[in-house]
């Protein structure tokens, strides 16, 4: 990188393993500045519980970004609303979690930070606090006023984007419209080019129904919706292969000639990716006006404060964000 950049990290649920993982991230030097939006006392306490060194440096947006020395983090303080006890959810801290996300998002929007890396949150406790919260993806979409965002998970070997995200199965067929597919594929194609540096992205597209509809005998969404959209976009120069049956698409015959897979719904594409690379995956939100990556796992409340949480996915998410920053320069 030509000069140091500054990224912002949110540890997520304070009672979970997120704060532990952030402390573990700090045990190595980084070529960028790591600004953590969190309660400083919480991070200091977790470092002590893990027996790891940690010095918190004050965040100053007026000071040029510098590489992060090992054993340190730059702190952008947000105060807990109640004490955080490892492994025990506290509804009073639901607003704290949302406040960290809002401050980090706003910092990306105003140019303070080059990317945002998020730790795992507990959706239930946030909603129990009276805050409507579906997930990070939807939260950042609304706060950034993005027209549309796309959820994509990635490992070193595989990228899977979703046409729909957190919808019940009975609602998915109605949600797969020509307008939706045009938007999702356009965003996926654009961000693969601009954020991943792929000049001509090759995208595999899953069918919605078993056997991709079997010529209309197992559903007509492929014939009525998916195929016409793909034909239109191919005519514009996009390299799209599909719709293909999801039960046979995930094999080298297809994947060796593709840069990403577009699945029609959450549990069509993600089980394969998580089986192939759980703990090494990264969640990326495409379509935002900034770079956002995240771990691919949950809060792991039972591991909080015990030093047993695996930092691998967080390291991968941070490294991918750094690569994406380079690609967009």
From Swiss-Prot:
Family: Belongs to the PdxA family.
Record-level Gene Ontology MF annotations: 4-hydroxythreonine-4-phosphate dehydrogenase activity; cobalt ion binding; magnesium ion binding; NAD binding; zinc ion binding
Positions with a binding annotation for a divalent metal cation: 166, 211, 266
Name of the protein: 4-hydroxythreonine-4-phosphate dehydrogenase
Annotated HAMAP family: PdxA
SUPFAM superfamilies from the UniProt entry: Isocitrate/Isopropylmalate dehydrogenase-like
GO cellular component: cytoplasm
Gene (UniProt): pdxA
């Amino acid at each position: 990188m030509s000069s140091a950049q500054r990224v912002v990290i949110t540890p997520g649920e304070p009672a979970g393993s997120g704060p532990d993982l952030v402390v573990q991230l700090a045990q190595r030097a980084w070529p960028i500045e790591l600004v953590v939006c969190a309660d400083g006392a919480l991070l200091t306490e977790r470092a002590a519980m893990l027996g790891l060194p940690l010095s918190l440096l004050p965040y100053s947006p007026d000071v040029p970004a510098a590489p992060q020395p090992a054993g340190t983090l730059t702190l952008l303080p947000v105060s807990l609303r109640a004490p955080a006890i490892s492994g025990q959810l506290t509804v009073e801290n639901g607003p704290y979690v949302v406040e960290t996300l809002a401050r980090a998002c706003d910092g990306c929007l105003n140019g303070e930070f080059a990317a945002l890396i998020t730790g795992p949150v507990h959706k239930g406790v946030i909603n129990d606090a009276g805050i409507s919260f579906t997930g990070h993806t939807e939260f950042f979409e609304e706060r950034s006023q993005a027209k549309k965002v796309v959820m994509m998970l990635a490992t070193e070997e595989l990228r899977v984007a979703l046409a729909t995200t957190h919808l019940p199965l009975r609602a998915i067929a109605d949600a797969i419209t020509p307008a939706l597919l045009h938007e999702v594929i356009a965003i996926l194609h654009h961000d693969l080019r601009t954020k991943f540096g792929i000049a001509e992205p090759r995208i595999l597209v899953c069918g919605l129904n078993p056997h991709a509809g079997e010529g209309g005998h197992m559903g007509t969404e492929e014939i009525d919706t998916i195929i016409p959209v793909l034909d239109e976009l191919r005519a514009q120069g996009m390299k799209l292969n599909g719709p293909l049956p999801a039960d046979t698409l995930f094999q080298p015959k297809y994947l060796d000639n593709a840069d990403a897979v577009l699945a029609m719904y959450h549990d069509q594409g993600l089980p394969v990716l998580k089986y192939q690379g759980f703990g090494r995956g990264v969640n990326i939100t495409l379509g935002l006006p900034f770079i956002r990556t995240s771990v691919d796992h949950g809060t792991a409340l039972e591991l909080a404060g015990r030093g047993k949480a695996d930092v691998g996915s967080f390291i991968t998410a941070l490294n991918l964000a750094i690569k994406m920053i380079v690609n967009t320069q």
